[in-house]
């Protein structure tokens, strides 16, 4: 047979994208986000979007250690403070206004959590990097004032990560789930009975039904409703008031949306992703009291900048602990 007569594999539209959308996700309702705010013309590893009670935005830059403050509505960006700990990955706000900063440390055993006042002063350890071996990435508060955090350690064949609960008095740490390949994002359902966890290096979404104590898994209550596809994997997540879950896909320049049972119902794309831009989408968050979702991403690989993008979501965001 002449070589010109052989069957030919050819790219379909979109399949030569740097980050092609898997076939099983191509029929999902899809929107492309709009630019909302440029944080830097440099590629910074933005993370940890969180709003204070005044409606202003805080976020962190992991590798440089800067905690940014964005005054709204004028969107003025300032440096609030520099983390004295290595690789801060998330900022959460207590209802009394204190800032809780999770840091990854050396990515092996020196992560922890410290708290500061609203101006970034008076640092105090909550989870010390001296007496523990966590690599702490994301937290979420419950209504009692305790919080869950993800342990970002391990990789696909070394299951060292997990999720832990810190009591409201910050005196005890209880394991909830363990043996994960880089636990990353964590979110609570509106009734606080379901815990969502993303497992980056295994490309899995965990749905955990909790008993009243908040740490015991209900009988048959731990499941994996979704397996993600592609490199790298699921990152931080948040919920809306309809209990939909929004999961940033790191390395893919998009956010996937799931209903409260874990079925995919939509997706949000970063502009330029097919050409390899803004693939480091890390964290979604809602502007308080609205259905406007913002997502941070950066373009380090292409010597590009660091941006926050925005869309209208399915429902208004859920009011988290700092607004209680």
From Swiss-Prot:
Binds 2 Ca(2+) ions per subunit. The keyword Cytoplasm applies. Ca(2+) 2 binds at residues 109, 111, 129, 132, 134. InterPro entries: 6-blade_b-propeller_TolB-like (IPR011042), SGL (IPR013658), SMP-30/CGR1_Lactonase (IPR051262). Ca(2+) 1 binds at residues 47, 137, 184, 235-236. Its EC number is 3.1.1.-. It is an enzyme of class 3 (hydrolase). Its main location: cytoplasm. Pfam families: SGL (PF08450). It comes from the Bacteria. Its cofactor is Ca(2+). GO terms for cellular component: cytoplasm. It is found in: Cytoplasm. GO terms for molecular function: hydrolase activity; metal ion binding. Keywords: Calcium, Cytoplasm, Hydrolase, Metal-binding. Coiled coil: none annotated. The active site is at 235 (proton donor). Belongs to the SMP-30/CGR1 family. Exhibits lactonase activity. Acts in cells with perturbed membrane integrity and is possibly related to the membrane homeostasis. This is Lactonase drp35. It comes from Staphylococcus saprophyticus subsp. saprophyticus (strain ATCC 15305 / DSM 20229 / NCIMB 8711 / NCTC 7292 / S-41).
């Amino acid at each position: 047979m002449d070589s010109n007569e052989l069957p030919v594999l050819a790219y379909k539209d979109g399949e030569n994208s740097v980050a092609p959308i898997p076939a099983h996700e191509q029929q999902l309702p899809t929107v492309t986000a709009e630019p909302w705010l440029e944080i830097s013309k440099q590629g910074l590893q933005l993370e940890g979007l969180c709003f204070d009670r005044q409606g202003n935005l805080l976020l962190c830059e992991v590798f440089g250690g800067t905690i940014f403050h964005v005054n709204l509505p004028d969107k003025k960006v300032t440096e609030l403070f520099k983390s004295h700990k290595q690789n801060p990955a998330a900022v959460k706000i207590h209802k009394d206004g204190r800032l809780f900063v999770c840091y990854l440390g050396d990515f092996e055993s020196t992560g922890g959590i410290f708290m500061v006042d609203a101006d970034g002063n008076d640092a105090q350890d909550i989870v010390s990097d001296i007496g523990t071996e966590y690599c702490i990435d994301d937290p979420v508060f419950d209504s009692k004032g305790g919080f869950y955090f993800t342990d970002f350690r391990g990789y696909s064949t070394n299951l060292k990560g997990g999720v832990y609960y810190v009591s409201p008095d910050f005196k005890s740490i209880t394991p909830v789930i363990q043996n994960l390949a880089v636990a990353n994002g964590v979110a609570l359902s509106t009734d606080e009975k379901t815990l969502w966890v993303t497992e980056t290096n295994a490309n899995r979404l965990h749905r955990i039904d909790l008993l009243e104590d908040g740490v015991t898994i209900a009988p048959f209550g731990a499941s994996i409703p979704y397996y993600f596809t592609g490199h790298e994997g699921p990152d931080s997540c948040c919920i809306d008031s309809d209990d939909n879950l929004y999961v940033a896909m790191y390395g893919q320049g998009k956010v996937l949306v799931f209903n409260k049972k874990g079925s995919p119902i939509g997706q949000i794309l970063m502009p330029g992703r097919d050409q390899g831009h803004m693939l480091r989408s890390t964290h979604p968050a809602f502007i308080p009291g609205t259905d406007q979702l913002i997502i941070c991403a950066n373009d380090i690989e292409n010597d590009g900048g660091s941006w926050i993008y925005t869309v209208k979501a399915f429902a208004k965001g859920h009011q988290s602990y700092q607004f209680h």
